[in-house]
């Protein structure tokens, strides 16, 4: 690997460690020319399906959009950041396991709702009330009745 300090092509790996999650390899390297040390990280490159929005446009999957929407729904609720990250990991696992090149934003919304329902009932209701775009109180009441069953 090329040294970021002097540009020399020959570097030596002096230490390799696996992350706790097992998805990243951390390597300490030493340049054979300038003798400086640096760290590199090796991760699996995942290709998520393109997201097809309601208007038909396509955008890249964005983990941060999912995370932000879940955080908003769970604002001031007793749910840890770690629990949110684990829920997102389950959502992403489902997205990758289907092996499809495209997925509708509505499908992602349903996956988010399923995870929120497991994490926090109030967060689920908050998200569903925005996601489902209720027109009147009766639709909201129907959703609550469905939720109680």
Swiss-Prot record:
Keyword annotations from UniProtKB, A to Z: ATP-binding, DNA-binding, Metal-binding, Nucleotide-binding, Repressor, Transcription, Transcription regulation, Zinc, Zinc-finger
ZnF endpoints (unnamed): 3-34
Cofactor(s) needed: Zn(2+)
Cited InterPro entries: ATP-cone_dom, NrdR-like_N, RNR_NrdR-like
GO biological process: negative regulation of DNA-templated transcription
Domain of life: Bacteria
Function in brief: Negatively regulates transcription of bacterial ribonucleotide reductase nrd genes and operons by binding to NrdR-boxes.
Family: Belongs to the NrdR family.
Protein name: Transcriptional repressor NrdR
Gene from which the chain derives: nrdR
């Amino acid at each position: 690997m090329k040294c970021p300090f002097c540009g020399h092509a020959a570097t030596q790996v002096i230490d390799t460690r696996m992350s706790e999650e097992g998805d990243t390899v951390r390597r300490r390297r030493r340049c054979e020319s300038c003798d400086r040390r640096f760290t590199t990280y090796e991760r699996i490159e995942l290709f998520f399906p393109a997201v097809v929005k309601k208007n038909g446009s396509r955008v890249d999957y964005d983990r941060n959009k999912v995370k932000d929407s879940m955080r908003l729904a769970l604002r001031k609720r007793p749910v840890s950041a770690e629990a949110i990250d684990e829920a997102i990991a389950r959502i992403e696992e489902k997205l990758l396991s289907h092996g499809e090149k495209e997925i509708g934003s509505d499908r992602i919304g349903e996956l988010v709702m399923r995870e929120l329902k497991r994490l926090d009932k109030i967060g689920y209701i908050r998200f569903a009330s925005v996601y489902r775009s209720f027109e009147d109180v009766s639709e909201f009441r129907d959703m609550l009745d469905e939720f109680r069953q």
